[in-house]
Amino acid sequence: MSDKWDLRFIELAHHISSWSKDPSTKVGCVVVGADREIRSTGFNGFPRGIDDSLERLQNREEKYPLICHAEENAIMHAARIGVSLKDCTAYVTWPP
């Protein structure tokens, strides 16, 4: 990838991080194939079906056992829709 594309994908990951409801940490991830196609995205948050109320997100004892990393959510999303991530690159706004 070129620096121009790397910058575009990390900027997109920063935008996606704003979708997180976590009041203290916002992380985004964009997973990209070799031909610069976006295969999946994710942000830190609770898994589907788990109540993500502000009260729960502000309680560390409840939050940390449940919350998923942005890259973890991107991988789960790709698996759910049947998209291969083989040989892809993940652009993440914060190290795992």
Language-model-detected regions and their locations in the chain:
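Zinc-dependent deaminase catalytic domain
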Residues: M1-P96
